[in-house]
Each structure stands twice: as C-alpha cells, then as structure tokens.
Amino acid sequence: MIDYKKILGDYTPDYEESLRLKCIENGIIKKLNDIISSRNIDAEPVSVGSYSKGTNLKNSDLDIFIVFSKKYPKNEMESIGLSLGHYILENGVEKYAEHPYVSGYIENVKIDIVPAYKIEPGQRIVSTVDRTPLHTKYVIENTDENLRNDIRLLKIFMKANNVYGSEVSKAGFSGYLCEILVINFKSFDAVIKYFSKLKGRLIIPENSGKKFQEPVVIVDPVDPTRNAGAAVSLENLSRMKIASKLFLLNKNESFFYPREISPRYHKRGTCIYIITLKRPDIIDDIIYPQVFRFERQIFNIADRYGFMPVSSEINVDNNIEILIELQRDVLPDVSKHAGPPVDSDESINFINVWKDRALRGPYIERDRLYVDSETRIKSFYDALNLELKKMDIGKNLNKLKDGIKIIKYNNSDFNVVKKFFSKDIFH
C-alpha cells in the first residue's frame, strides 16, 4: 500500500517554513496597508497563490497583489503599483506580464508584488491577472485540509512526471488546474483514474467542447468565458494519461519523485546538425515562442529542399541550441521537379519553360508533368545559410542572426544533444 503521508511529508512545508512565510507575508501586508493608508490610495493588498490557498509545496514563492479601484487609469495604477512594490522590495526588479510587477527576495523567499484591478465575480476583467484573487477565494471556499493535501499530491505527481507548469516552455498543467481537478473529482485517486480512462480531449464540464477547441478544456469556475486549460499541450495531456495508466498498474512511490535520466547515445545512421546562437536577455515567455518558431522553420526548410528531416529538439540556457536530424544532408546532382497536372491550364506553360532547361523531360507520370533538373543547392549547410538571410525568426532573434552557427554533430558536447538522446515518455 502506497504511503501518501510519507510523500506529503517529503514535499509539504514544515512548521518552521510555514511560520517564516506567515511572518514575511504579515510584514508585507502591514507595510503596504500603512503606506496605502498614508497616501490615501484606493487599493488593498491581497495574498494570493498556492501559499494563501494552503496548497503550496516546499520552497514556494509568495504572491502579493495590490488590487486597485477601477477609477485609476491603467498607466496610473501600474505606476503606483510599481512604486509600492519597490517600497517593499528595495532590491526588486521590474518584470512584465500583462501588467508590470516587482519581483525580489526577502529572507531568501521569492516575492512577487503585482498591481491589478479589483473585480467581483462576473465583472469584466482588464487583464488576466485581475482574476487571480478570485481564484484564491474559490479554492479556499471549496477545499478542506484533506482536499488541499490531495491537491499537493497531484502537483507532486505531475511535477515528477514532467507535466506540471503553465509557462510557455513547459505547456503543462498549472497549480490552479490541479486545484480545479481535485475539487471537481473530490480526490487525488479519482483524478488519476479519470486520466487513465480518458479518450481524446479533456473537457470539464462535458458540454464545453464546442465552445473551446484546445486539447484540454477546463472552464474557469470564476469566469465561464475562459478556458483555464488552454496552455496545456496535447503532448502533456497524452503524457498524463500514460503516467496515470502506469501508476494504476503498479502503484509505487517512484511516480512521485524525479527520475534520473541518462542519455543513451547510439549510432543512428542519420545526419545531425546543431544550430546555436546566444540567448538574448529576455524572459522565457517571450523567447520560447521565437525559438519554437525558428525550430519549425528549420524543419520545414529541410523538408522543402528534400533533406528528409526526421526529428528536432531545442534547449535554451545561456545559449539557444536547436538540433535537427536528417536522413541525408547532401542531395544528388539531379532533382525530380513536379509540375502541374496535365489538365491544368498551366501545363503548356510548364513545358515551354522547361523544354530547353531540363536535364530530362518534361515527361508524364500518371496525370502530372515532371522534369529532372540540376540540383542548385546540394548541402543542408548551404541551404540553411541561404534561407537564414531572408528568414523572420522573431523580433529578438532577428537581431542575433550574425551570431548563428551551424555545426554538424560529431560527438560534440551540447546540452541539446544530451536532451535528444535522453528522450523518453516523461522527457
């Protein structure tokens, strides 16, 4: 029998950590209340996030929202909010989501102080962060200690199986989704059973599938116009289904702890290239969409030229690394070029264009015209170099094109190669 209490004990903050967080939170709230009152600001500080809900794991952050009256214009609200954030976090740095906010540390605890507008259930939001205090209220009102521990178990399970985290780089399940799922199904075990039997998309409530098209549809209990599961990828939904099936077949504690994965290097008989460039100093949520876009463009170029791409991988640290695996990286001297169907109005024009240029043809196969022509660009390296000059790889990456390197893999030490050869169900 699996010992959930032991697992929770390994991940749940102890009394000392909880007391320290409470003292820090109380101190921040008091200082904010004092300065808000002294400056006659129509706002109030609110503790949100997993700590305030009682669903946090060890080493959690503190999220303090300053909720403003809607009488303040957006620019003024943000300006006041940032000044209050810097008042609390003297060495804090400004970060940007939909609203700018201040992030820093107090006694080695990460603190985010976020300005937002105060809204009531059903009211129109100005930005997505405005819902967050309502999320906190919803979870507190709909959970008891047992459910909160089951929420923790689900978070632990998802983290260990690499499907937790709503950031763009992960595209997994957020903490709020874990809370909604456990509240909906009443226990951790019921959530796992649901995933193990799920066919197709996840849709809660079941009649919401037509309204939203994403793989995971979980209507936000505080805002029926929002799909809280929109960020979850089909791959991570699939991974969670498999993890749940495997867990129910063999219930053991290993499903709640990170697995050590070692690369399994082997000869593949393919051609592997690494495209590298320096990472710009911008946040993950901005850089990752550009890297994913660049990866897709490289793959599509390889396919269009006929290098027969097999797979790809990315890794983003201090450098951006994109791996592309090809069945071949050099093309033959002759390429077969497809023309229009013979029934097309363009068929005669195609013949006239190619009759004196083709190495062979034009000729017909079934109902289409073809020619054999000389391959102009034969190597993947040359093709990608040519295409890079005109490729749009995103606002921030475009500025770094001159620093892009294209390297043919030959047992070189790249993080993306380790990641590629470590790939399994959960990685």
UniProtKB/Swiss-Prot annotation:
Species of provenance: Picrophilus torridus (strain ATCC 700027 / DSM 9790 / JCM 10055 / NBRC 100828 / KAW 2/3)
Designated name of the protein: CCA-adding enzyme
Reactions performed catalytically: a tRNA precursor + 2 CTP + ATP = a tRNA with a 3' CCA end + 3 diphosphate; a tRNA with a 3' CCA end + 2 CTP + ATP = a tRNA with a 3' CCACCA end + 3 diphosphate
Other remarks on this protein: A single active site specifically recognizes both ATP and CTP and is responsible for their addition.
PANTHER family linked: CCA-ADDING ENZYME
Quaternary state and interactors: Homodimer.
GO biological process terms on file: RNA repair; tRNA 3'-terminal CCA addition
Gene3D superfamilies noted in UniProt: Archaeal tRNA CCA-adding enzyme catalytic domain, Beta Polymerase, domain 2, CCA tRNA nucleotidyltransferase, domain 2, Poly(A) polymerase predicted RNA binding domain
Keyword line: ATP-binding, Magnesium, Metal-binding, Nucleotide-binding, Nucleotidyltransferase, RNA repair, RNA-binding, Transferase, tRNA processing
Residues given in the record as Mg(2+) binding sites: 61, 63, 112
Protein family membership: Belongs to the tRNA nucleotidyltransferase/poly(A) polymerase family. Archaeal CCA-adding enzyme subfamily.
Biological function: Catalyzes the addition and repair of the essential 3'-terminal CCA sequence in tRNAs without using a nucleic acid template. Adds these three nucleotides in the order of C, C, and A to the tRNA nucleotide-73, using CTP and ATP as substrates and producing inorganic pyrophosphate. tRNA 3'-terminal CCA addition is required both for tRNA processing and repair. Also involved in tRNA surveillance by mediating tandem CCA addition to generate a CCACCA at the 3' terminus of unstable tRNAs. While stable tRNAs receive only 3'-terminal CCA, unstable tRNAs are marked with CCACCA and rapidly degraded.
Cofactor: Mg(2+)
Entry binding sites for ATP: 50, 53, 135, 155, 164
This enzyme's EC code(s): 2.7.7.72
Annotated GO MF terms: ATP binding; CCA tRNA nucleotidyltransferase activity; magnesium ion binding; tRNA binding
Binding site for CTP: 50, 53, 135, 155, 164
Keyword ATP-binding: yes
